[in-house]
Amino acid sequence: MMKTVTIDLQIASEDQSNLPTLEQFTLWATNAVRAEHFEPEITIRIVDEAESHELNFTYRGKDRPTNVLSFPFECPEEVELPLLGDLVICRQVVEREAQEQGKPLTAHWAHMVVHGSLHLLGYDHIEDDEAVEMESLETEIMTGLGFEDPYSYDEE
């Protein structure tokens, strides 16, 4: 049976309107992680563009805010902790992208949580074959949650 992901939700955004609920974040992360043998924990921090920009520059060398940053927790092998890591999601970027792509806002929030959670599990999209695998898994998870394929909007 799939274990529920415990979410530590931190809201560091001045505007807290139109944010998903803790229950929504939990549902989306749980469906992405699909843990069966442990009860994972993820911190989700909702930030404004200034914090996203600073973190994106510090950790990725990108001089702009981004939609989601993933910080996997690296635990020594001899220590068993259920912490998967942290997701930092920029509210303004998510809202802007949803509007630009013609996506429902809730669907884009869900996609960012699924996408970031998969990064915490070690998935990546740097190489083409990795991107195909990760995007396929994202689509499977999102449609399983009742959303449309998140990449179908990019083609319109």
From Swiss-Prot:
Entry-linked HAMAP family: Endoribonucl_YbeY
Q: What's its EC?
A: 3.1.-.-
What top-tier enzyme class does this entry carry?
A: hydrolase
Which family does the UniProt entry place this protein in? Belongs to the endoribonuclease YbeY family.
Main localization, broad class: cytoplasm
Q: What does this protein do?
A: Single strand-specific metallo-endoribonuclease involved in late-stage 70S ribosome quality control and in maturation of the 3' terminus of the 16S rRNA.
Cofactors, names only: Zn(2+)
Subcellular locations according to the entry: Cytoplasm
Q: Where on the tree of life does the source sit, at the highest rank?
A: Bacteria
What InterPro entries has UniProt attached to this entry?
MetalPrtase_cat_dom_sf_prd, YbeY, YbeY_CS
> What does the UniProt cofactor note say?
Binds 1 zinc ion.
Identify the keywords attached in UniProt to this record, alphabetized.
Cytoplasm, Endonuclease, Hydrolase, Metal-binding, Nuclease, Ribosome biogenesis, rRNA processing, Zinc
Q: What is this protein called?
A: Endoribonuclease YbeY
Question: Lineage of the source organism?
Answer: Bacteria, Pseudomonadati, Pseudomonadota, Gammaproteobacteria, Pasteurellales
UniProt-listed SUPFAM superfamilies: Metalloproteases ('zincins'), catalytic domain
Source organism: Mannheimia succiniciproducens (strain KCTC 0769BP / MBEL55E)
Listed under GO biological process in this entry are: rRNA processing
Question: GO cellular component annotations, sorted alphabetically?
Answer: cytoplasm
